A protein has these predicted regions:
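Sequence/structural signature of outer-membrane beta-barrel proteins
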Residues: 36-44, 76-87, 118-131, 159-167, ...
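Signature for the C-terminal beta-barrel architecture of outer-membrane proteins
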Residues: 26-28, 64, 107-113, 131-227
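Bacterial N-terminal signal peptides that target proteins for export
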Residues: 1-10
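Hydrophobic alpha-helical segments of integral membrane proteins
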Residues: 14-16
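Short acidic (Asp/Glu) patches
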Residues: 98-99, 127-129, 139
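Beta-barrel outer-membrane channel/assembly domains of diderm bacteria
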Residues: 22-117, 143-149, 216-225
Length: 227
């Protein structure tokens, strides 16, 4: 039985194809399946006993490519094999798949606008990571603007993290991550050399959880050795 995620996936796909059919000519499909066996090493495991479980993650991706506008859909199913929520071997409703990513991009002059639900990796995943090593991964919902500059690239983003409309009734109390991130290339030092300054703000009025973060990271290449 189709769940709400699959229905939203299908509706979004068909609406986009219908609206952009006049210039969209390319469609790229891809799929992957990852199986992983893990062992439990906690103190709860009795001596001379082995406790293990299996994780499985599958993804189906579709890219709809137009002249200036593109749409990207990634439907993901992530589960631990054999858990009761799967209803394995039993007639019933299983846990549902979900849209891990669904976003649209528009290519303008020196700028790219991206809106929807997407992964965001900054600073070689040291600043913000996709967390794809786990069984689910991390994605954000919001707006991302990329602008090419003479010295590299600038990113501007705003990402609502927690919506509190049903409890606080005040937009200022929503949890929002926003900021700017620069990729500044340094060809005079090495081909792959760059510095990445950033400014970020996390808004969480409750419990005084808001904070600002300033910093930078650097990749410096010398004689083909990257530091």
């Amino acid at each position: 039985m189709f769940n709400n995620s699959i229905a939203r996936f299908s509706i979004g796909l068909f609406v986009f194809i219908f609206m952009e059919n006049s210039f969209c000519t390319d469609y790229n499909w891809s799929a992957n399946l990852r199986y992983r066996l893990k062992t439990d090493t906690s103190n709860d495991v009795k001596e001379n006993s082995v406790s293990s479980f299996s994780e499985m993650r599958s993804r189906i991706s579709l890219d709809v490519l137009g002249d200036n506008a593109t749409a990207h859909f990634i439907l993901q199913d992530s589960r631990i094999v054999g858990t009761p929520a799967n209803s394995a071997g039993v007639t019933g409703n299983t846990i549902g798949s979900a849209l891990h990513q669904v976003y649209f991009t528009y290519e303008g002059y020196k700028q790219t606008f991206q809106i929807g639900r997407f992964e965001l990796a900054l600073g070689n995943q040291r600043i913000i990571a996709k967390n794809n090593w786990n069984n689910t991964g991390r994605s954000f919902e919001g707006i991302l603007v990329k602008r090419k500059t003479k010295i590299g690239e600038r990113l501007l983003f705003t990402l609502p993290v927690v919506e509190t409309y049903d409890t606080e009734y005040d937009d200022s109390k929503d949890h929002v991550l926003s900021g700017m991130y620069w990729n500044i290339i340094l060809p005079g030092i090495g081909k792959s050399s760059k510095i990445e300054p950033y400014i970020m703000n996390y808004q969480q009025v409750q419990d005084n959880g808001s904070y600002n973060m300033f910093g930078f990271r650097a990749d410096l290449e010398r004689n083909s050795i990257l530091f």
